[in-house]
A protein has these predicted regions:
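Assembly/oligomerization interface modules of large self-assembling protein complexes
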Residues: 1-25
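Short, contiguous, pocket-lining structural segments
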Residues: 17-21, 39-47, 64, 80
Length: 226
């Protein structure tokens, strides 16, 4: 406002109407009454757990595929420590430009997780060492251990998923509550069961509805490898 008491600018908020595609994920198994009656309840629970587990794998795979599809390249990593620094910060710059948001997560496939854990400095010390009680890591850009996927390379929360294609590395912002680049929605509908008297059987199924949305595609950056 200038001068004082002059009219201030009026801004109208515009809320976008985005269409989000919904995907139905489901699986089923058919059992005879003999299988049901002659099998222990514990064994039946294994069947139900398997249905739920397969649904969870399919849901995760859909999210992983859609996240990678939405990503835009921020460069190529040659496998060295120095180039990793450049690639990650190039991605962070691409995310921050014109938005003032910073990345929060690094999503990688298991092979890339292995590459990160094996990176060493010129003296052979791990760049991402395991830091135990009372020990201080040297040259620690983050920390990692071969017994866990947890880590924070360059301050980013590491997420490792075997449903990603090999050589996948994605830098983005999620879970912050504001400025999230990628969103995931899920409605688990659960187990359904239907008797089929004509064949003395029972059909059991498990299903749910899943959606993903690339809210800010420019903030989903991938780093490829040669």
């Amino acid at each position: 406002q200038s001068p004082e008491l002059s009219a201030v600018s009026a801004t109208t908020m515009v809320i976008a109407s985005n269409s989000v595609a919904k995907t139905t994920l489901a699986g089923q198994v058919t059992l005879s009454v003999q299988d049901i009656d002659f099998t222990s309840p514990a064994a039946m629970q294994l069947i139900l757990n398997d249905l739920m587990g397969e649904y969870m794998i399919a849901s995760d795979n859909l999210a992983a595929d859609n996240l990678l599809t939405a990503a835009t390249s921020s460069g190529v990593w040659d496998g060295t420590v120095a180039d990793l620094l450049k690639s990650v910060y190039d991605s962070a710059v691409d995310i921050s430009n014109g938005r003032n948001w910073t990345p929060t997560h690094m999503f990688v496939s298991p092979d890339v997780w292995g590459q990160l854990g094996q990176l060493a400095d010129t003296t052979g010390r791990p760049v991402f060492p395991f830091i135990g009680a009372g020990l201080t890591g040297q040259n620690a850009l983050g920390n990692a251990t071969a017994s866990s996927w947890n880590g924070n390379p360059l301050g980013l929360q590491l997420v490792v998923d075997s449903n990603f294609a090999a050589k996948t590395m994605i830098i983005t912002r999620v879970g912050a509550g504001s400025g999230d680049a990628f969103e995931f929605y899920e409605s688990i509908r659960g187990l359904q069961s239907l008797q089929t008297p004509s064949t003395l059987g029972r059909v059991m199924s498990f299903h749910g509805f899943v959606s993903t949305f690339a809210a800010i595609p420019g903030m989903i950056r991938k780093i490829t490898q040669a």
